[in-house]
């Protein structure tokens, strides 16, 4: 039986309801097709109207130029009679002047309303200012100084200088997570000052952040401190004590001056509150060690402060105790805010008088780089304050934060003698136990000895730990080195010019552009791409020279121009200008110098990780998603048509829209072109193509990025197409061994023979493999640039808040105790 008879029987066998449904569906599809065509025609009409408007504006501009030229006095224009053509243009000029007058009146009304608004705001500000002027506290906070304290015994040139620095109010250092210390001197405890002036010093037990409310009455006063003369157990400024481990149950004798987490002040009534960082400072030149092991890990802000709190002014040659006796007067209570910084080389310290001064620190850059830290149990000796720059410790051996130098309150002469007799090996250093036991958190300072004392144990300890540190650096896990790798996940930069609607010009490109014929950026079946520069602006661009042999070739070029005129996306190349000649057409486009993505795949020196492929694939899907939203099929997606913005980043741009087509629902589009190994089965079978055709190519590109292999490549084009038609591919066991199941699922859902079963671009962007980038980066021991920028922004905001708090507290401490 013939095919015609079968068809007639088939139609006759259908029920009437089915025929009605098919007819209704065809009618609706026809209506939808007509609406899409109407939209396209409307868009073309709008484009034509805009172009005609531009032409009219050009004509108007030329008319104005002619009018200005006619008003200028000519050689024979003494009679002042206007020309006939000039008189014809006067009515239009009058209309334009009237329109300008109306616009000026409208703008004047708007400016008047804006002026009234500004006047109201000025009155409100004046009211607020008057309210603040009546407030004594607000006036003090705004000015930052107290007039009635001028000339008080507590003022000094140093304090005046610090006030000037405070009035500037500009932050000079970046502040990371910092602890705040407040030192308060109670008026009721001034009676104990005599004990301190006689040479006594207090020994306070260690206080953690949880014990901020410790009673200062528990302080034990121990003699042994003279009036500045170094005692037998005192350390010199150049001969600072070495830290060592301290037993958990060490006896506390009155001769010791132990202090962990508290600052030794000249007055016994001064109580230091440490939260949450620990500040270690030897008081009055004595070494200090921890009285019991601290189970909590040390904060990054642990520092060795240079001196014991604020000192009263006096002769510079006197010791601290003598200067305190010299001032004599009673000092009102003060609050000292200590800010600890770990992000910048210079540290900012709010001293007892509220100054912002740099402190001497021993920087440990590895504290801010977790990827370069060694294991927690690794023993390490921190660089001494007097160490030369060439004597720095290895980066892998640093984990604790910098310590500040400690200074002795002795006189200048005694200080010079002590510095002369000091040994290089007796500088302060921070030690941590090598075994990972409960002594890891113990921190101590051991009294340094003179050369005659013969106690080289701390120096030998550091020397013995040197090979251990080197071995620890060698045994660092590979993830520690990878922790410093930062991946740029920022979006691709936009074109250096605004999106424009380009029309073909029938002039030579050499009139406005300088084409570098010797510099070829790429090429293909169409011709070559050269680098060019716009003469008027110097803008670097790319000139795509297409050979034209027939009218069909010109239509293809115009189709490419029309498609690129509708594209404005950061992942799609932008068109800048177009020229047409007898034998060629030239498209001037955006220039990127990162090379083809295909070069990244084939380059043996460049190692693509799975996270790199995720960043590339996500941007490809974003560009394809934009194309499909505008009913455009690329139909030639391959690594050669994807350019990288730079040599190292992950930003890409899709190029070559020569084979792109506009998709229409009722139009059965068939194509028989493209690169064989990237063709979809429907293209090989010469069937209807649609959006899933591009998604097949995305799947092939992703497979190549992950493995470096082509899934369907055969020895010949015929074999390749046979593999594609049968959809015969698999995951190579060697290349896909370490890849995640999410990546395999992503590829498997794209390389499907049935095009209706493939993922769309929207579904790809929602796939689990292309999302949760921070979690994937943390698993691969890398960091994302977006995370670093976010952390930097948060740190800046936190720094500003802390700076304002410190400034306000530093001013509030200057209030007198009684009105």
UniProtKB/Swiss-Prot annotation:
Its EC number is 2.7.11.18. CDD domains: STKc_MLCK3 (cd14192). Residues 307-318 have a biased composition (Pro residues). The active site is at residue 636. It catalyses: L-seryl-[myosin light chain] + ATP = O-phospho-L-seryl-[myosin light chain] + ADP + H(+); L-threonyl-[myosin light chain] + ATP = O-phospho-L-threonyl-[myosin light chain] + ADP + H(+). It is an enzyme of class 2 (transferase). It holds the Pfam family Pkinase. Phosphorylated on serine residues. It comes from Homo sapiens (Human). The gene is MYLK3. Restricted to heart. Disulfide bonds: none annotated. The keyword Lyase does not apply. Keywords: ATP-binding, Cytoplasm, Kinase, Magnesium, Nucleotide-binding, Phosphoprotein, Serine/threonine-protein kinase, Transferase. Residues 146-256, 273-334, 347-462 are annotated as: Disordered. This is Myosin light chain kinase 3. One of its GO terms (biological process) is positive regulation of membrane permeability. It is found in: Cytoplasm. ATP binds at residues 521-529, 544. The modification Phosphoserine is found at residues 152, 355, 401, 408. GO terms for cellular component: actin cytoskeleton; cytoplasm; cytosol. Residues 158-170, 183-196 have a biased composition (Basic and acidic residues).
């Amino acid at each position: 039986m013939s095919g015609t008879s079968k068809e007639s029987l088939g139609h006759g066998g259908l029920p009437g309801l089915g025929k009605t449904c098919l007819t209704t569906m065809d009618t609706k599809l026809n209506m939808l097709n007509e609406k899409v065509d109407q939209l396209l025609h409307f868009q073309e009409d709008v484009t034509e109207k805009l172009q005609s408007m531009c032409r009219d504006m050009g004509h108007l501009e030329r008319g104005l130029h002619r009018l200005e030229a006619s008003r200028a006095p000519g050689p024979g224009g003494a009679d002042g009679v206007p020309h006939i053509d000039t008189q014809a243009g006067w009515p239009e000029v009058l209309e334009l002047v009237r329109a300008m007058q109306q616009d000026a009146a409208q703008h004047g009304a708007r400016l008047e309303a804006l002026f009234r608004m500004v006047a109201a705001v000025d009155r409100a500000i004046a009211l607020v200012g008057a309210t603040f002027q009546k407030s004594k506290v607000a006036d003090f906070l705004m000015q930052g100084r107290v007039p009635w304290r001028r000339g008080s015994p507590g003022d000094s040139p140093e304090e005046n200088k610090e006030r000037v620095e405070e009035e500037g109010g500009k932050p000079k250092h970046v502040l990371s997570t910092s602890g705040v210390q407040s030192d308060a001197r109670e008026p009721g405890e001034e009676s104990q000052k005599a004990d301190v002036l006689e040479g006594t010093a207090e020994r306070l037990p260690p206080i953690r952040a949880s014990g901020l409310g410790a009673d200062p009455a528990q302080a034990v006063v121990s003699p042994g401190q003279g009036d500045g003369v170094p005692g037998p157990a005192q350390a010199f400024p150049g001969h600072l004590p070495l830290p060592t481990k301290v037993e958990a149950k060490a006896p506390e004798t009155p001769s010791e001056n132990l202090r962990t987490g508290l600052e030794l002040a000249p007055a016994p009534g001064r109580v230091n509150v440490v939260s949450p960082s620990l500040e270690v400072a030897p008081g009055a030149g004595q070494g200090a060690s921890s009285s019991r092991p601290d189970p909590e890990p040390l904060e990054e802000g642990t520092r060795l402060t240079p001196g014991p709190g604020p000192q009263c002014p006096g002769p510079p040659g006197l010791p601290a105790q003598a200067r305190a006796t010299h001032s004599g007067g009673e000092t009102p209570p003060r609050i000292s805010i200590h800010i600890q910084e770990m992000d910048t080389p210079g540290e900012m310290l709010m001293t007892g008088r509220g100054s912002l001064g740099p402190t001497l620190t021993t920087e440990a850059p590895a504290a801010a780089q977790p990827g370069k830290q060694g294991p927690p149990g690794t023993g390490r000796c921190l660089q001494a304050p007097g160490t030369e720059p060439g004597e720095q410790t290895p980066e892998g051996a640093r984990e604790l934060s910098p310590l500040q130098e400690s200074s002795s309150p002795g006189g200048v002469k005694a200080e010079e003698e002590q510095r002369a007799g000091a040994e290089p090996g007796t500088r302060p250093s921070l030690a941590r136990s090598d075994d990972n036991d409960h002594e890891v958190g113990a921190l101590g300072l051991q009294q340094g000895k003179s050369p005659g004392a013969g106690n080289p144990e701390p120096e030998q300890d550091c020397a013995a730990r040197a090979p251990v540190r080197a071995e620890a650096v060698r045994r660092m896990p590979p993830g520690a080195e990878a922790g410093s790798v930062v991946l740029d996940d920022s979006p691709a930069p936009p074109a250096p010019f605004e999106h424009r609607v380009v029309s073909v010009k029938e002039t030579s490109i050499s009139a406005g552009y300088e084409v570098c014929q010797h510099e070829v950026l790429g090429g293909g079946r169409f011709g070559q791409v050269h680098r060019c520069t716009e003469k008027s602006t110097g803008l670097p661009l790319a000139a795509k020279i297409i050979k034209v042999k027939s009218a069909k070739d010109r239509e293809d070029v115009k189709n490419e121009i029309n498609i690129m005129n509708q594209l404005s996306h950061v992942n799609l190349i932008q068109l800048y200008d177009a020229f047409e000649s007898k034998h060629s057409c030239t498209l001037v486009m955006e220039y990127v110098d990162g090379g083809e993505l295909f070069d990244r795949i084939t380059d043996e020196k460049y190692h693509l990780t799975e996270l790199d492929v995720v960043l590339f694939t996500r941007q490809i899907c974003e560009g394809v998603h934009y194309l499909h939203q505008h009913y455009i099929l690329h139909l030639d997606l391959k690594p050669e048509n994807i350019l990288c913005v730079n040599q190292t980043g992950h930003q890409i741009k899709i190029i070559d829209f020569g084979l792109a087509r506009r998709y229409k629902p009722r139009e059965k589009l068939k194509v028989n072109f493209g690169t064989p190994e990237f063709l979809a089965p429907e293209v090989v079978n010469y069937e209807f193509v649609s959006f899933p055709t591009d998604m097949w190519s995305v799947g092939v590109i992703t497979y190549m990025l992950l493995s470096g292999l082509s899934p369907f490549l055969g020895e010949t084009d015929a074999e390749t197409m046979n593999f594609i038609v049968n959809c015969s591919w698999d995951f190579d066991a060697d290349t896909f061994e370490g890849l995640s199941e999410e990546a395999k699922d992503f590829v498997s859902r794209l390389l499907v023979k049935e095009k209706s079963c493939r993922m769309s671009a929207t579904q790809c962007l929602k796939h689990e493999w292309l999302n949760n980038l921070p979690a994937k980066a943390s698993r691969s021991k890398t960091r994302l640039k977006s995370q670093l920028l976010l952390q930097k922004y948060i740190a800046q905001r936190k720094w500003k808040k802390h700076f304002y708090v410190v400034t306000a507290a530093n001013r509030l401490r200057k209030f007198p105790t009684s009105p």
